[in-house]
């Protein structure tokens, strides 16, 4: 079993309130779940108005499939946030359990 965890740190420069920031993050989380069927949540920088963190977890029996899903999630996030937020950093952890 392969698990891949992604921690995506976002810059949301146009947000002037936590409500505006959370609207961007919540929309991203919901669309990731609906489109890619991955586990995801807002996990950090909760009180920062112009920044946020989203965690994504992928589990697969096949390393190639898991990596492909992680790559697809990154591309989806970039496209989804275009003009609304920027990706500051993506931390990736890959674990294999036998």
At which residue positions do the language-model features occur?
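N-terminal first-folded block
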Residues: 2-39, 76
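Hydrophobic residues positioned within well-ordered beta-strands of beta-sheet architectures
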Residues: 4-8, 54, 88-90
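C-terminal structural segments of small proteins and small subunits
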Residues: 60-98
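Generic secondary-structure boundary/loop-capping signal
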Residues: 9, 15, 43-46, 94
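Residue-level signal for beta-strand positions within conserved beta-sheet cores that form or flank
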Residues: 36, 52, 83-86
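Residue-level signature of transmembrane alpha-helix interfaces in integral membrane proteins
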Residues: 27, 53-55, 71
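Short, charge-patterned binding micro-sites
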Residues: 4, 41-62
């Amino acid at each position: 079993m392969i698990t891949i965890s992604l921690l995506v740190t976002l810059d949301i420069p146009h947000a002037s309130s936590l409500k505006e920031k959370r609207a961007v993050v919540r929309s991203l989380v919901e669309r990731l779940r609906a489109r890619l069927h991955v586990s995801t949540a807002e996990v950090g920088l909760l009180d920062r108005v112009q920044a946020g963190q989203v965690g994504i977890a992928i589990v697969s029996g096949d390393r190639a499939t898991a990596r492909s899903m992680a790559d697809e999630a990154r591309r989806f996030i970039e496209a989804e946030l275009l003009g609304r937020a920027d990706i500051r950093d993506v931390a990736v952890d890959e674990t294999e359990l036998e």
